Amino acid sequence: MVKAVAVLSNSNEVSGTINFSQEGNGPTTVTGTLAGLKPGLHGFHIHALGDTTNGCISTGPHFNPNGKEHGAPEDETRHAGDLGNINVGDDGTVSFTITDNHIPLTGTNSIIGRAVVVHADPDDLGKGGHELSKTTGNAGGRVACGIIGLQG
């Protein structure tokens, strides 16, 4: 079993921890708990770079090793890092579990060293008709991020 973790934070009181685990070549399970977010849906993605030198903006675009358009997690055409939305409760907190086959912790397309990003707005899953729908899901600014690090 390979395990990884990302600790999310920013200057706006958003905080939390996201854990990743993968058994063999199976899917990766993502579990997380976050606090300090506005209630409602927030886009949730793996971004290409593990660089936070300029805050979350330095994490680059969505992780997309296959050069596809943005989509929903269940779509065949999607970025590898497209994990859809998390639904934050009225108290500003969310706990979630996601299982995904496109974000391995080992191999050529490993997400280790990349970043996980929570966005300000809902991800339209590439179906919103906005000019940004097919690249970012029109999910708005980046409100929190963390670098995905390997755990022992």
Swiss-Prot record:
Binds 1 copper ion per subunit. This is Superoxide dismutase [Cu-Zn]. Coiled coil: none annotated. Homodimer. It catalyses: 2 superoxide + 2 H(+) = H2O2 + O2. Its cofactor is Cu cation; Zn(2+). Its EC number is 1.15.1.1. It comes from Pisum sativum.
